[in-house]
Amino acid sequence: MSDAATTIPSDEIDKLWNKARNQLVEAQVECEESLKILSKVRTEMDSSQKSRFKLKFILNCLVNQVEFFKNIMLEKCISTELIDNEWSKLVLVEIVNDVSYWQNEITTKMKILQGTKYDLTDDHSSLSDFICMDHVDILQQKIDEIPIIKQQVTNIRQHYKSIKDRIENQLVAVKLKKLRTYFDSHFSRDSKNNLFKLLESDYVTELNEFENELADFLRSITDHFDKCTILKEQQIPLPDLKELFQIVKKDDTQLENIRELVFETGLEVKAFSKKVNETISEIMDKIGGFHLLASKIVTELEKCEEYLSIFQKIANLVFVYKESCIKKIEQVQQLCEFYDKFKLGYKNLLRERDRRKATALQMEKILKECQEKLQALSDADLDQRQQFLLENGDYLPENIWPGYIDDMESMYSFEYSIHNVPN
């Protein structure tokens, strides 16, 4: 160790070591600052790149929402199911036809009852006197409401067409198309104006290069400091030590250049950070423009949803009309069935009247025949009594059969009445 000391001045070694240590500390501080800047830049770049996927997601959501509103809500639910099927076919055709049919039925039934003469008493002239004639108007109110319902459906068709045109000509053809074009122009991977390309490619390459350069600078300065430390400790053979000393002295001459490169790289990193931030700021401006266009579409969709309340109100109106018609039709059906049975019952009643009259006549005939037979028998009885008295009266005292022997009163009394059956 003493030989090495005589060969290599220790103060010179100390000078080299101290210089290497100072340069390493300063370089570490500068590189750490630059690396922090680069780390922040990378984070901001990653965050900005994620925003592109968010924008794509928002665009797809809006496209799907518009398509859903146009194809499902408007065309399928409102146009096909509600207007064409529920209203136009079921209500305006089937229900209206049923209402008209049953109105005609009950009117016909009423006329039949009016034309059916009542023959049992003089208090009424026809069977219609026994029913409420107001029933003929049960469905008339619904018939009177048909033009109103038809007009409402016509209005709603026009309203539907207006909304559909608004969706197709303004929302889809203008606003949504403008948003697509804006996205493709500024955020599509194939667009020349896509600033995300810088974040995804060029800037990433630059950032990696800066990180590699700083790592190389630190590696070189650290390696030089490690050599100085070995030289300072003087634990290797003298020939190796001398060789190391020459290497260290040579590297020392490059140390200032490396430090200058570290400093310049730090300036470049700051400039790079500024450039990236400016690009990100420009991207954020573009994103702001996207959100502005998207918000207009959202506002338009909200208006369209409000328009649906009009369909709901008309739907409720038509539903109430339909349900009311169904109930009235059921009521009229029951009345028509009752009127048929009422007329049939009246015909059967006339038959019953005739049957009772025939029965009364038959009873009267039987009773008259009976009366005639009884009278004949009574006459024969009187003749025989008189003959008995002529033959035996003079010989029999009256007290032998008191009250009967000379009694000439008929042995029967016959009274009857038959209930009158009116014509």
Swiss-Prot record:
Q: Name one GO cellular component term.
A: Atg1/ULK1 kinase complex
Please indicate if the UniProt record lists Membrane as a keyword: yes
Q: Where, subcellularly, is it found?
A: Cytoplasm; Preautophagosomal structure membrane
Specify where it is mainly localized: cytoplasm
Q: In which organism is this protein found?
A: Kluyveromyces lactis (strain ATCC 8585 / CBS 2359 / DSM 70799 / NBRC 1267 / NRRL Y-1140 / WM37)
Q: Name one GO molecular function term.
A: protein kinase activator activity
Q: Alphabetically list the UniProt keywords.
A: Autophagy, Cytoplasm, Membrane
Taxonomically, which superkingdom?
Eukaryota
A Pfam family this chain is assigned to: ATG17_like
Entry keyword annotation includes Cytoplasm: yes
Q: What is the lineage of its organism?
A: Eukaryota, Fungi, Dikarya, Ascomycota, Saccharomycotina
Q: How does it sit in the membrane?
A: Peripheral membrane protein
UniProt similarity note: Belongs to the ATG17 family.
Name a single GO biological process. Answer: autophagosome assembly
Identify this protein by name. Autophagy-related protein 17
Instruction: Tell me the function of this protein.
Output: Autophagy-specific protein that functions in response to autophagy-inducing signals as a scaffold to recruit other ATG proteins to organize pre-autophagosomal structure (PAS) formation. Modulates the timing and magnitude of the autophagy response, such as the size of the sequestering vesicles. Plays particularly a role in pexophagy and nucleophagy.
